[in-house]
């Protein structure tokens, strides 16, 4: 549909629409976000999910076409990566389509415990040395020889490195560095192919949902260091060490989020965080109050204090935890929900926090377009009242979502979401 507006005007119009929603004002209409993920494979009809890892140019063009055709207010296009960089290093805890999985299979994470229960002191005392000589060898097959390197503090001194250099000459260590070099080359190719995407989309009038990321400290430990089983046991067996680790990681997460300020665009600049293991089903309220919420809250407050808008993705069901979000700065964040009842979220947070979400991915997969339209109409009526609501799918789109249903979702705000 022709608007007669320039890309610059459309970009600012969309940014203002989002700003108004964040600030709990009434925009001209309800904003809508498209999370493309692996959906471009289905939309363009000639690619597989594996192409997001192995044909970066084609995947970027497919993603661009998807966004330009459907015309959301914001987009999130996080999917894929360099399959060759991954292949060079041999990840033990990750499988991706086209290598170990079918070309149209979703990527898979494999639970592990790279940080063992009795290694907290080692990790806390020197996370850099732990990462190099323990974490990387356990997570990447090609980097297993790094376990033979000398402790990093043992290299301090004007001439010490020379006397400690022998391990670096071992054939297996050299091979590990060669694998890392090859991965770096492949990642550089990937970066060159994808680094201009956000600016290209901006020049077409489309802002991104987020300009950077910052991880929740507890999730860093549970996702990447101790695994879910290990972290859940630590809440009983190693609570003090777990809390110390969360505190240490918090500063890194804040720094990661603040780096978003360097983004060329964004008014305001937005920082995303996917929250994996803080929902109702993972821990009790007491455990949430002790282990999860304190560092997450401080992360969000620290970023909003710097003028950033935090966009936490509350995965799972957060119905029992909604009141905690009232402790966050009013009108400064976007609470994106996956499976939380949005009517309840609106009732609790409506005058305090912009909420985002709503359309179940299952509906986009199997329902008729009319069913999707009816669902969106009702959702907009309930959650859009008074402003402070952004429509999107419950999760990132896969290649199983029906294109006509995704289009219906996006078009619904133009039909039913005008204030």
Describe the role of every protein-language-model region.
Residues 1-419:
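Catalytic cores of TIM-barrel enzymes
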């Amino acid at each position: 549909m022709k608007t007669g507006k320039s890309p610059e005007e459309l970009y600012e119009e969309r940014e203002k629409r989002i700003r108004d929603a964040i600030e709990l004002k009434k925009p001209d209409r309800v904003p809508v976000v498209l999370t493309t993920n692996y959906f471009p494979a289905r939309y363009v009809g000639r690619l597989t999910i594996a192409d997001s890892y192995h044909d970066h140019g084609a995947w970027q063009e497919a993603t661009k076409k998807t966004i330009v055709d459907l015309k959301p207010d914001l987009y999130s296009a996080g999917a894929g990566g360099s399959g060759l960089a991954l292949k060079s290093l041999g990840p033990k805890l990750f499988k991706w389509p086209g290598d170990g999985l079918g070309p149209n299979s979703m990527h898979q994470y494999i639970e592990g415990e790279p940080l063992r229960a009795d290694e907290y002191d080692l990790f806390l005392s020197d996370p850099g040395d732990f990462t190099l000589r323990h974490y990387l060898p356990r997570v990447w097959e090609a980097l297993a020889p790094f376990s033979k390197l000398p402790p990093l503090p043992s290299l301090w001194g004007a001439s010490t490195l020379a006397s400690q250099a022998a391990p670096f000459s071992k054939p297996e260590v050299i091979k590990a560095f060669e694998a890392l070099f090859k991965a770096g080359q492949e990642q550089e190719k990937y970066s060159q192919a994808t680094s201009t995407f956000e600016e290209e989309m901006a020049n077409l009038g489309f802002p991104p949902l987020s300009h950077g990321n910052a991880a929740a400290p507890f999730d860093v430990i549970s996702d990447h260091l101790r695994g879910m089983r290990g972290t859940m046991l630590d809440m009983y067996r190693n609570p003090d060490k777990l809390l110390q680790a969360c505190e240490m990681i918090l500063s890194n997460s804040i720094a990661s989020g603040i780096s978003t300020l360097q983004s060329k665009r964004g008014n305001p600049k937005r920082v995303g965080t996917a929250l994996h293991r803080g929902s109702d089903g993972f821990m009790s309220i007491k455990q949430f109050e002790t282990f999860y919420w304190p560092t997450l809250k401080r992360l969000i407050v620290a970023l909003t204090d710097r003028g950033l808008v935090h966009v936490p993705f509350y995965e799972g069901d957060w119905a029992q935890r909604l009141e905690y979000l009232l402790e966050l700065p009013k009108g400064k964040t976007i609470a994106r929900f996956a499976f939380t009842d949005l009517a309840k979220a609106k009732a609790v947070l409506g005058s305090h926090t912009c909420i985002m979400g709503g359309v179940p991915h299952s509906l986009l997969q199997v329902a008729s377009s009319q069913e999707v339209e009816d669902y969106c109409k009702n959702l907009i009526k309930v959650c859009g009242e008074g402003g402070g609501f952004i429509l999107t799918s419950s999760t990132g789109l896969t290649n199983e979502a029906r294109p006509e249903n995704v289009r219906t979702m996006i078009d619904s705000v133009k039909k039913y979401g005008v204030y």
